[in-house]
């Protein structure tokens, strides 16, 4: 009854109007799973390959018909007849079919779409929500949201070098309250920016994208908004940054054009340390570039005992890259993006490896998202305690927050909000 009888993919659009892959999986019992694959703007060089057609006459070369054809042809022919509850076997079969180290032949977007849709169909077959099917009976921790309320870098058309300025409402009693706190700060920030003469247009992830050129000015606006919303910075709500520094690491220097700075690795570490000394920043993602291992070591030695140092481009949710980082003693946290590695099984392996090394995990969206809320379920399934899924606007971001509210309600009294447990200080 849990046998796969049909796999069908189609080309749909993501939140930036670019094509992406959506996959439907149907089982003999009638159980059904659907998954849409996200896409990143700032992508790591070591990520699995997102297959694009390259046909400039369609979607400016960004079509995904080849990935769709791979699902509807080769992958479907192989997997129809498989038991959907055999997730590991299904994922391994697709990886072996692809035969490349980076899923470049079939495309990570093809493989991941099938992988997640299979898990959803199996969850429906077993009459369980996805978080329970993947995480088992111990899945009960609701994550602290990292809410991206000012966008810069590749996510916005403004001069800010740092890509994301986030708030983390650790003092909330539950995820509903955390989302409310974030919403109140977001709307207060809008008023503050407007009063300062800045535009309040939003970036890819729903945060504001004002023409602020200084990192400190952006942080000051956020602190003021937290206070005016009735909360205490560094007590109720902390700050987090995603530098996405690979994007401005050129010729061995950190070229921060908005700030007018050209920094060596050591100077970049000092720059970040000074920000942490002056502001209640508890998490920095990609503070150094993906291949600046020396810089990462300096950063970890300087800040690792008191600040969460998240590897995104550094680790790309890849167990091999993570193992290299653990051995080198760099970073202390991994950002988890399912499409960076390209299958549910490999994602869970990487999360487990990080957990065993006492690294934290942060479940994450991509800048190109859809209404698919799978990552909310995966955040709870893995008990990772943190989720990064954008701001308090755009339905593609709110879909994940709303799903967390539903999951918390479903869990009832056994639900736990991670809250202050994530703090390193």
Swiss-Prot record:
Binds a second Mg(2+) ion via substrate during catalysis. It catalyses: (2R)-2-phosphoglycerate = phosphoenolpyruvate + H2O. SUPFAM superfamilies: Enolase C-terminal domain-like, Enolase N-terminal domain-like. One of its GO terms (molecular function) is phosphopyruvate hydratase activity. Coiled coil: none annotated. Mg(2+) binds at residues 242, 285, 312. Its main location: cytoplasm. (2R)-2-phosphoglycerate binds at residues 163, 337, 366-367, 388. Pathway: Carbohydrate degradation; glycolysis; pyruvate from D-glyceraldehyde 3-phosphate: step 4/5. The keyword Ligase does not apply. GO terms for cellular component: cell surface; extracellular region; phosphopyruvate hydratase complex. The active site is at 205 (proton donor), 337 (proton acceptor). Gene3D superfamilies: Enolase-like C-terminal domain (3.20.20.120), Enolase-like, N-terminal domain (3.30.390.10). Catalyzes the reversible conversion of 2-phosphoglycerate (2-PG) into phosphoenolpyruvate (PEP). It is essential for the degradation of carbohydrates via glycolysis. This is Enolase. The lineage of its organism: Bacteria, Pseudomonadati, Pseudomonadota, Alphaproteobacteria, Rhodobacterales. The gene is eno.
